[in-house]
Amino acid sequence: MNDISSDDIFLLKQRLAEQEALIHALQEKLSNREREIDHLQAQLDKLRRMNFGSRSEKVSRRIAQMEADLNRLQKESDTLTGRVYDPAVQRPLRQTRTRKPFPESLPRDEKRLLPAAPCCPNCGGSLSYLGEDTAEQLELMRSAFRVIRTVREKHACTQCDAIVQAPAPSRPIERGIAGPGLLARVLTSKYAEHTPLYRQSEIYGRQGVELSRSLLSGWVDACCRLLSPLEEALHGYVMTDGKLHADDTPVQVLLPGNKKTKTGRLWAYVRDDRNAGSALAPAVWFAYSLDRKGIHPQTHLACFSGVLQADAYAGFNELYRNGGITEAVCWAHARRKIHDVHVRIPSALTEEALEQIGQLYAIEADIRGMPAEQRLAERQRKTKPLLKSLESWLREKMKTLSRHSELAKAFAYALNQWPALTYYANDGWVEIDNNIAENALRAVSLGRKNFLFFGSDHGGERGALLYSLIGTCNLNDVDPESYLRHVLGVIADWPVNRVSELLPWRIALPAE
């Protein structure tokens, strides 16, 4: 084999140096790409944290652009490192989730399968038990009616001929045919699952039991009479002095004597301080009114004093005059007005305003669940400087806008409500927005889509009662149907002076 010449060695060294220089350049380029990816990912995460509320209210343009930039850089990084980009494979590859076991409380029917033959299929030898494989499948059995027959035996005394018999057990509805479980199903189906009574009647008919809509309506009415003491106890608890969330929504109500409807109102009042570290149970109380006049919330809140967190509805203004109730309004409303303009006419101004409001929400996400004193300290340190800067910015930009423009109106709304809008920064118990009350009204909105209207003002009142109890169950992670079944089974004989013991968070439901 020929010896390698000095020229070949020189050429190889030169090529090696070139390759090392290229590798160094690619490594530097890769490092720059990785740093840019990390920076974009951090900005994207921050922007996502800033944007609260429904998805339609997010600043989606900026998020989409940043995601596109991030994907482009990740593809370039893959090319530099030799990784093959496959859009079907997520980055990083997600591990297979472990299936969550079924709750132990569910009843189980076991099917035990034995080998087809009692002997070995290969040699005919006898078989002995070695072990077993088990698999579970979730099944839904058709809900079944059951008739509970109560037999009270009569016994006669052999000496004095006296007749002895056990007393008849109480029924939720006197001389009624429905047990507490069936009544609870009817109430839950209508007010938690939003199934109108006529549909329930059809469902029960397909199961062979004829229950007319008028009969079901009578049961609902009777249950509301039974549960009315609970509503009073719930109202007293919710109206305890402190901080309260309030909101309202329109409902259609059928006018008597014709097929036309009028617009009534359902008011929601929520006591929920869990975001400020409180261990007290959350609760919601609903009230029905014929219209939206201010006299209704003034009557509802006659015994309340503290902070009322609501929208800027003028009907609340009378409550604030004597100083017993302090106004705190909702940043979500202020943000929504700016966002609506941003959706129609996006601009640097709307984007900047939404970004600054997003920074306020990012602070709230970090302090959610902390004690009120700690939340106040964080807001004093972080939120107040941002609010001061935002106010100055809004006032400065107002000078450049036509006062008739939609954006000027949105900015003016925030500035006109500024003291109430920024009150939360001075009170650790108060929230940045009124979403707690808005969330409580979602059940009403869903029900409104299904049964369209209340049949009367009385129907609106009984709806308010049941929305109160079911909504409070949901706030406390209590199953509404199990709760109503238990309460309807005992309330007829329950002492009136102890009715507060039957509130959703105070009873331990028996195992079913």
What are these regions (language model features)?
Residues 1-177, 245-246, 252, 278-280:
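Short, flexible loop/hinge motifs at secondary-structure junctions
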